[in-house]
Amino acid sequence: MAFVDQAEIEVKAGKGGDGIVSFRHEKFVAMGGPFGGDGGHGGSIIFKVDEGLRTLMDFRYNRHFKAQPGGNGGTKGMTGASAEDRYIKVPQGTTVKDVETGEVLGDLLENGQELVVVKGGRGGRGNIHFATPANPAPELSENGEPGQVRKLKLELKVLADVGLVGFPSAGKSTLLSVVSNAKPKVAAYHFTTLSPNIGMVRLDDARDFVMADLPGLIEGASQGVGLGFQFLRHVERTRVVLHLVDMSGIEGNDPYTQYRKILDELGQYDETILNRPHIVVPTKMDMPDSEENLVKFRQEVAADSGLPVQPEIMPISALTREGVQPLMRLTADLLATAPVPESYRPVVEKVSNDKTYDFKPEQHNFTVEWSEETEEWVIGGAEIEKLFLMTNIQRDATIMRFGRQLRHMGVDDALRKAGAKDGDDVRINNSDFVFEFSD
């Protein structure tokens, strides 16, 4: 039994550090020249598979992830410190998609496998890189490149670790609703659950697992009666079984008789299920006759020589929550050492190569639009916006360099073709400039 766990998050890589303008000022060193260092690289965000994780629950509480920026350059040609990459643990079998494009960035299938999902910006260059014979003392530097930003959709096809079995109305749906994020329909009548409800259980110690409330079993299920085969196939793929038994004795039902009927059906379908780690969970201990019925039930189970092993018995009341947390902790302990059944197959297929995602540079695409509201030309485009952010607009020399870069990209020609005239206002990334066409 598999279901798809999903989460949408935003990841933002670190900006590169800024290069600086600096000059060598030392005694006896005339005309020392430029000495400004480069900025350090920003941190990337990298997903890494941790086979100990079972769900995407962590991403429901934390949807925004940022890496640190690189350090700015220093004097004497010193390069700023590069930021450390940020590693985020994901479960085995996670598929990563770009929300905006729908592109699959990668499938993370092997323990320890890594995938760079956003790449940190490179550091801006200091003025030491811009010296030429014509300009031996440039006041030019670059700001750091912005880090990449992406909205990602994570998908994980999950198999239930723990299966809740028992007769209809044994309290399976109620227990699941108490310990997990699932919201099954719960009512006081038989056959409440006709298809599996699945929830993710998270303990205080950060352990988590997937629990399934399986369709109520009836006598004859191993021969296909009712939901028989469908139910038993679900049980077959769980690693730990919690066998819920109603202790209330309502409608004259005998707890031990019901317990034995479930075991018989499981054994007739597949005897190996009986050897799987399991806990017997007497339920509805808040009811008037439950304590008395539990004493009798324990005696009958202890005297049953036909059981493969004497089971752990942990009574609970889902209504009052009594015994629920100890039960969940013991369940997690069993899962830590439970063998993986043969039927517990991986449910993802590898659709892309194991590789770091190849980030392709942006094309020279930009837009030129006239804004009636502000009466100015608006220039847009990812590459232009990146160039602007890497331009130190506090220095005239770098602004002039930015103008030359735009001209080289064809922005001047596009403005002139669109009808721009000398003196028109031009807005780029919320900053205003005056258009002057150069031949």
UniProtKB/Swiss-Prot annotation:
Give binding positions for GTP: 166-173, 191-195, 213-216, 283-286, 317-319
Q: Where does the source fall among the domains of life?
A: Bacteria
Family membership noted in the UniProt record: Belongs to the TRAFAC class OBG-HflX-like GTPase superfamily. OBG GTPase family.
Q: Gene3D superfamilies under this entry?
A: GTP-binding protein OBG, C-terminal domain, GTP1/OBG domain, P-loop containing nucleotide triphosphate hydrolases
Assembly with partners or alone: Monomer.
Which residues are recorded as binding Mg(2+)? S173, T193
List the source organism.
Leuconostoc citreum (strain KM20)
Can you say what this protein is called? Answer: GTPase Obg
